[in-house]
Amino acid sequence: MDKYNIEALIGEGTYGVVSRATVKATGQIVAIKKIRKILIQNQTDDGINFSAIREIKILQELKHDNVVNLLDIFAHKSNVYLVFELMQWDLQEVIEDKSIILKPADIKSYMKMLLQGIEACHRNWVLHRDLKPNNLLMSINGDLKLADFGLARQYGSPNKVFSPQAVTIFYRAPELLFGAKSYGPSVDIWSIGCIFAELMLRTPYLPGTGEIDQLRKICSALGTPNESNWPGVTCLPNYIKFTDHPATPFKQLFTAASDEAIDLISKMLLFNPSNRISAADALNHPYFTSGVKHTNPADLPVPFAKKASLLQQRQVLAQVQQQLLQKQQQQQQQQQQQIQSQPEPIQVDNVEQTQQAQQV
């Protein structure tokens, strides 16, 4: 704790509070999450929630530009503290800010960073299981990073089962709504498809009020799942037969979207999980190589409420970096002066030559 100056409380989560702090040695602004240690159900003997431990383990192993960076872990007064890079806002704030006009190039940039982050997770056998706009955080440089790995799980073991009660309901895949306990990375891809739609619509695509209503919303938008378009669906534990309903063509809903964007989202929002596109294949989709080039992250729009504080933080960061650079230069100059002030060693050959000359 001595390494940090705690400045202000900035949030509170399920397992603790989050404060803004500064690293004393460097001036770096960070976020410190304090994990509460209270002995309740589903916790270790030390009183730390299993989800918090799982999040720590996963973030220690996952190092990627589009995954939030866990910088430090320490204990203080019987509490555990996680130190993260400070993120400025989340994607939900961008979507809801009506002063922002999201251009196709902006959406492409968000989607590219989101897919890069989840591809890194899946490559390391991690399911996020709770992708939604307010879990996608933005850095001071405009980089999108996946956060909140409290529901994340390692996958890949044969017959491994999970709870279907994962993922916020707007972004929950149909196999989870039907009670599947064995599933894979396709649940994250479904969530990303819903986020893609939300970026284009500026409102949640499938805003259900409960599991049954969520399934109704899905059927209304995408048609009705059956053994023809999803073999095995009728065998899922909580399968319910819905009235046959035709799908609404994506082009009819996303009128301004390119053909490539329509094709990509249609491959993400397929009923059959086995047929959904993978994150790696999505990154190689023509959507990212055709049409407008994605916006540079540093040029992405900033929520109106964050502009003033962001400018101030960038100025402070620039000043701190300048001070650190000057300090390094001074240290280098001092080292050079010390080297120059040291007397040159006397060469033995020169001494012998001088003695011989004196004898002559």
UniProtKB/Swiss-Prot annotation:
GO molecular function term, any single one: ATP binding
EC annotation from Swiss-Prot or TrEMBL: 2.7.11.22, 2.7.11.23
Keyword list, A-Z: ATP-binding, Cell cycle, Cell division, Kinase, Meiosis, Nucleotide-binding, Nucleus, Phosphoprotein, Serine/threonine-protein kinase, Transferase
Residues bearing the modification Phosphoserine: 157, 163
Active site: 130
PROSITE patterns: PROTEIN_KINASE_ATP (PS00107), PROTEIN_KINASE_DOM (PS50011), PROTEIN_KINASE_ST (PS00108)
Entry GO terms, CC: cytoplasm; nucleus; transcription factor TFIIK complex
Compositionally biased spans, kind Polar residues: 350-360
SUPFAM superfamilies listed in its UniProt record: Protein kinase-like (PK-like)
Family statement drawn from the similarity comment of this UniProt entry: Belongs to the protein kinase superfamily. CMGC Ser/Thr protein kinase family. CDC2/CDKX subfamily.
Name recorded for this polypeptide: Cyclin-dependent kinase 7
Protein species of origin: Dictyostelium discoideum (Social amoeba)
